[in-house]
Amino acid sequence: MKKFLSLLLVLVLALSFAACTSQAPADVDEPVAADGSDLEYVVGNGKMVIGYTVYEPMNYTDDNGEFVGFDTEYAKAVCAKLGVEPEFVEINWDTKEVELKAKNIDCVWNGFTITEERKQNIEFTTPYISNKQVVVIKAENKDKYTDTASLSAANLVAEIESAGEGAIKDDENLSKANYVSVAKQTDGLLEVKSGTADAVVLDYTLASAMVGEGTDYADLIIIDGLDLAVEEYGIGFRKGSDLAAKVNEITAELNADGTMDEIAAKYDMSAILVK
């Protein structure tokens, strides 16, 4: 019996030692935990993962293959002051909040319209751009479509979950139209250009940069005088994130030293820059 107990004790000790020694050492390259502070999380990781969709003039690739845009340069300037690298990740706009909550991205920095509904789940910075929704049609239809009443029987498109979609649903006339959502605002322009849609409701910032003479959409125009929802852009972080306040602080510095003015002038956005 004693011999059996001795053998059992040796076996237990051996198993305990094996279990302890088999544990892998901590990986020093693993991301820093962020149970409390997103600011500490981002600084600790040495990067800010920024969610975006292709949206000229905010985030896009130019003819030289360089990733540029107002929001792109703004984000780089903020990250430089934070001492971290910006990492831009293209996302599906419809799942942006899911990506944020899952920490696949640290923020949405992409012409993100501030709304009361979104504020319930998103921590926004103070506004930095004043924008509006406009309607783009083929130039040949400029006399046919002049106001929301004339568009009430048209085939409309807008980016899903966008301010453009909201403007359609909230307008008495536009809500009667034949509406189909698209994945991206640029998809809406393609639909109108190809003739599968009569009009697209989208951000003025994008429309003014991509439509008209000298662009790929030279045959499209913005309906003159038809301004829909007026809105403001903010950078979206996880609800309760301390990064929003820090970015506000840095933005104030960038306004003071003229950086924001320089970026806005470069992308012809000086008139809608909010300080």
Label the predicted regions.
Residues K138-L156:
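Flexible hinge/capping segments at coil-to-helix
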Residues D27-G111:
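Extracytoplasmic small-molecule ligand-binding "clamshell" domains
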Residues P31-A33, A163-V180, A218-D219, I223-D224, ...:
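Ligand-binding clefts/hinges and TM-proximal coupling segments of bilobed small-molecule sensing domains
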Residues M1-N45, I272-K275:
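Short, low-complexity disordered leader/linker segments with a strong preference
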Residues T95, F112-Q120, A167-D170, K193-S194, ...:
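A ligand-binding cleft/hinge motif common to bilobed small-molecule-binding domains
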